[in-house]
Amino acid sequence: MIIIITGTPGSGKSTIVDLLSKKLGFEKLHVSSFLIQNKAFSEYDELRQSYVIDEEKAFQLIDSFIKDKNVVIETIYPSLISHADKVIVLRKDPRVLYTELKRRGWGELKIAENVMAEILGVISGEAKEYFGNICEINVTNKKPEEVVEQILSNNCDNVDWLNIEEIQDLLISLDKVISSYEDSISDE
């Protein structure tokens, strides 16, 4: 059985994967660190402070690792996994997520892009497009153990941050941050 746990950075994926894999007795795979260890990247993006994944190599490595295993996979790249029995998308209130990423010391552009992705449901949309049936869980203000129980009971949420006016305002300010970086790059 393959269970994918995905969501924007800061949504709690690693913690949930650790708890869920232990509870089920499954192996776990933290995709980003696995790909870095196996040098499945093409370059390092200084501006975004992250590796650019070599998707073909990554897909092959992951497919080989998960073959014939019961595994819980933590990833922000759901399309790198060939198949899954269950896909869980962790969603977190963008205002809370913004604070969490800032606390981690992330750069302004990286925070803006990731919080905007959460508001717009980018990872959720990608997972839905790739796998069809997904389960979104709003993890905001929930203990990790509560989230694991919600996953096991298949109790999904319907998350739409764009219905909240304050979040619409946040989206506009994030867009300005991203645009200012894009403008500075095009000026070079």
From Swiss-Prot:
Belongs to the adenylate kinase family. AK6 subfamily. GO terms for biological process: ribosomal small subunit biogenesis; rRNA processing. Residues 103-113 are annotated as: LID. Keywords: ATP-binding, Kinase, Nucleotide-binding, Ribosome biogenesis, rRNA processing, Transferase. The keyword RNA-binding does not apply. Interacts with uS11. Not a structural component of 40S pre-ribosomes, but transiently interacts with them by binding to uS11. Broad-specificity nucleoside monophosphate (NMP) kinase that catalyzes the reversible transfer of the terminal phosphate group between nucleoside triphosphates and monophosphates. Also has ATPase activity. Involved in the late maturation steps of the 30S ribosomal particles, specifically 16S rRNA maturation. While NMP activity is not required for ribosome maturation, ATPase activity is. Associates transiently with small ribosomal subunit protein uS11. ATP hydrolysis breaks the interaction with uS11. This is Putative adenylate kinase. Residues 30-53 are annotated as: NMP. One of its GO terms (molecular function) is adenylate kinase activity. Its EC number is 2.7.4.3.
